[in-house]
Amino acid sequence: WVAWISGEYVVRTGCYDSRSEAEDAAEDMDGGYAEKVSDTAVTVTVTGTTDILFEYDYQGILPLGVQPEGWGEEPITWFKGYRYRGAFEYPRITGGNLSVINVVDLEDYVKGVIPHEMSGQWPLAALEAQAVCARTYACRTTKHQSTYGFDVCNTTDCQVYNGVNASTARSDEAVDNTAGECVYYDGQLAETVYHSSDGGATEDAANVWGSDVPYLQGKQDPYESAASIPDYQYTVTYTREELTWVLQNSGYSIGDVTNVYVSEYTPLGNVYKVTFEDSSGHSLTVKGETCRMAFYSTTYGKNVRSMRFTISGGTGDATVGGATGGSTSTSSGGSYSVNGNQTLDSLDGASVISGSGQLGTLDGGSISIITSSGTQTVGLGSVSNVRNASGTFVITGTGNGHNVGMSQYGAKAMAEQGYDYEDILNFYYTDITIK
């Protein structure tokens, strides 16, 4: 078989278990010689066999590249059940595994991302917004994986990319319509993060990840609720024993958990701090995205899906603040009609029964009530949750994701209401430019 070694073609005749066997075979050939095994070589074989077709070795300096040829303008290569445009490189880091890299035009790459991050059947404007976000992310992230020989990975660690398998005429059209366009802030490529759904409000990046990003500012989302969102609301239940195990196995220094509650909300109503208490009286407070990630457990198959949730079964005071503002505590004024013909001057001290049947006492704060005209919220500040003697904590929330940047279901809802992709991007990202 033919081999391309260090810039020249050679012919190889066989593989041997030892150098002496190779040297004996070489003596039977005019000009033959034995070559040691290389840890940077790449061998091409017939699929499913050991029959060698070609070998390549450039000491790891240049990888093997394969450019497919075929009929039509866009030859397609199959790899592990997926179809890809463009060429492939097969670098091998010295002593390491072989990498498979798809070398593809930027627009073809975006066409391979869109239908895996958003349904290819969604409204065109939503797909166009997603295309601009995906393109911006790729351009901004290029070369951050360069030590491995590629620009971006193909998983959720970067953006899901699986070639052309899931592409639709509409998703491809969205990419073509926005070709070359990216999101900029102050002349620089923006970090166009996105999530599935915000549950009613996005959030400041500072309140989720700790660093303020001027164009990643939270806001109430009046559009998302109009979309039909699967599993928009979620409920997850933990026992004290489960929470203790989850926290301790995640490396947190805490004893047997006896209480957990939201200790601070952001002004937009998303969770900013959660406090855990143990049987020794010690407390642990986490903030930002850790508020939901602290509950994550593959062992129990449980997680908190968004930054927008409440906890029942614990007891504690919650303030409204966040990283971008000081805590505030206010109470509602006036009187409240109860039981038809009675009034209360204050809700402090009022007895209530929770949705789970637990009896408790209010000490003021943000309270949802059912009136003749619907559900309303009164007060804003100190909230005391009802203690659950059974030791079970119930987390109820809306949305799915980190709540920062564009809501994908919100983009869908805006598109369905007639907004274009620029409207969508300008709503979810503050003071940006699209060009």
Model regions and ranges:
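Conserved, single-site charged/polar hotspot
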Residues: 1-435
